[in-house]
Regions:
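Conserved acidic segment of CheY-like receiver
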Residues: 4-25, 57
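Short hydrophobic/Thr-rich beta-strand motif most characteristic of the beta2 strand and flanking loop
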Residues: 32-40
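Acidic, metal-coordinating helix/loop segments flanking the phosphotransfer/catalytic sites
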Residues: 39-56
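Conserved phosphotransfer microenvironments
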Residues: 55-75
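Conserved phosphoryl-transfer motifs of two-component systems
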Residues: 56, 104-107, 113
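His-Asp phosphorelay/catalytic-motif detector in bacterial-type signaling
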Residues: 79-84
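Alpha4 helix (beta4-alpha4-beta5 surface) of REC/receiver domains from two-component response regulators
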Residues: 90-107
Length: 131
């Protein structure tokens, strides 16, 4: 049975959100179908996290003025029910920052569709479906 999961894409740049959506695709695994909601600003991101039942957050670590690493850290500190977080970073050397932010996974620009799909499938399949 295929589950539909909701993923938040956060970046201040529409082209980055489009690249993230394209790399993930709508079916990262045979049993997963994704739908996306987009956030172009920090305020919109936080509002959508509060409004939607999200299954995964994909945050751009390079977003301005609030980067995905800071948003991830804030959500981890302030929410007990935070969904899994994947942060996209520009340099592999910054993985330690992503770990400190509380991100469950990191991806590095440019996004590889195979790695991105596998990462998403792993994060979503380990998360229990809402009852």
């Amino acid at each position: 049975m295929t589950q539909t999961q909701t993923v938040l894409l956060y970046s201040d740049k529409a082209e980055i959100r489009d690249r993230m959506r394209l790399a993930v695709g709508t079916r990262p695994a045979p049993d997963l179908t994704l739908q996306f909601v987009d956030a172009a600003s920090y305020r919109e991101c936080i509002s959508l996290v509060d409004t939607y039942e999200l299954d995964l957050l994909l945050l751009d670590g390079e977003a301005q003025p609030a980067g995905g690493l800071g948003v991830a850290r804030q959500l981890r500190d302030e929410r007990d029910d935070c969904p899994p977080i994947c942060v996209v970073i520009a340099r592999a050397a910054d993985r330690w920052l992503a770990a400190y932010s509380g991100a469950d996974a990191t991806l590095v620009h440019p996004l590889d569709p195979v790695t991105t799909g596998q990462t998403f499938a792993g994060l979503l399949q380990r998360t229990p479906a809402p009852s």
